[in-house]
Amino acid sequence: MLDLYEHTDKYSSKNYSPLKLALAKGRGAKVWDIEDNCYIDCISGFSVVNQGHCHPKIIKALQEQSQRITMVSRALYSDNLGKWEEKICKLANKENVLPMNTGTEAVETAIKMARKWGADIKNIDESSSEIIAMNGNFHGRTLGSLSLSSQDSYKKGFGPLLNNIHYADFGDIEQLKKLINNQTTAIILEPIQGEGGVNIPPTHFIQEVRQLCNEYNVLLIADEIQVGLGRTGKMFAMEWENTEPDIYLLGKSLGGGLYPISAVLANQDVMSVLTPGTHGSTFGGNPLACAVSMAALDVLNEEHLVQNALDLGDRLLKHLQQIESELIVEVRGRGLFIGIELNVAAQDYCEQMINKGVLCKETQGNIIRIAPPLVIDKDEIDEVIRVITEVLEK
């Protein structure tokens, strides 16, 4: 009889190469494997479970809604959609929202919206509309999102991709000034790059991008799919620079770890370019998704998880920056979104931490990304600090 790993690998596609660790249960900031070993989860499904694993309030919302109605086509109204729309729009200070399912769908929607806005509002010819993205970004792996990537290894073999995409170094406003022109319809960026290595831009960079967009009448798209909803100690990472984008992209923890839901938020002057037939989603905004998402947003507020991320994130960052290790190049982060950059490959050290009960994952080969659920408590944070210190100082 095949074991769990062989059984899974026999039928799985080969686009993932997971660690041989199979999880069977999760509660709060902790998970348990099939042998009942416990770990503090510092991956959080890449910020999907900001509210913690299996939060009872979110589960209750899912259970109750699933007994009423789960699916209503957007050809009709439902009793939940308007309530959810109002909640998320007020949170993001935007007038309109377009619900989708996954993060990459939100990015694809934003690309379409930006191009349509450029054609309708700026009168840019469809053949010459340009978008500027940042080097080191990650916006998804569907064709439109992939076209924004600056990493050739992600794109190789999948062409032809979207054209007229240009790249600037993240944090280099002078490069942006050279690239932007009257054919530019949008600049898209992550306020803090996640997959790229927990990269924090220089002070005022985001504000300068906003000013540049204003000068050229260009849309600023903030991809907060991973860093939004409290992860960095602010509800939105853009708040660190007191800057408003034209379009917010949200996903991941918007569904509380239970249901895929994403959102594209903008004011009416931008959103109105999408008219009936120009875009849609079979499952986007369904009653079950809305019920789950409303509960997920309530948990963020009622349990003060944004403040918890700020407070415990400061504690975590301070202690990690005090580790004395020749391996460490830099420890950087905001809130509970921290990167430990090493001068060697990070995978072995991640595996050592996992063996000691802290679940983590490397990115870009040499960076350990630490991003626990925002429900984590002080004792759990201190245990994370102890394990990381023990592994890296050794």
Curated annotation (Swiss-Prot):
Keywords: Amino-acid biosynthesis, Aminotransferase, Cytoplasm, Proline biosynthesis, Pyridoxal phosphate, Transferase. One of its GO terms (biological process) is arginine metabolic process. It comes from the Bacteria. It is found in: Cytoplasm. Pathway: Amino-acid biosynthesis; L-proline biosynthesis; L-glutamate 5-semialdehyde from L-ornithine: step 1/1. The modification N6-(pyridoxal phosphate)lysine is found at K252. InterPro entries: AcOrn/SuccOrn_fam, Aminotrans_3, Aminotrans_3_PPA_site, Class-III_PLP-dep_AT, Orn_aminotrans, Ornith_aminotrans_bact, PyrdxlP-dep_Trfase, PyrdxlP-dep_Trfase_major. CDD domains: OAT_like. GO terms for cellular component: cytoplasm. Belongs to the class-III pyridoxal-phosphate-dependent aminotransferase family. OAT subfamily. HAMAP family: Ornith_aminotrans_3 (MF_01689). Catalyzes the interconversion of ornithine to glutamate semialdehyde. This is Ornithine aminotransferase 1. It comes from Staphylococcus saprophyticus subsp. saprophyticus (strain ATCC 15305 / DSM 20229 / NCIMB 8711 / NCTC 7292 / S-41).
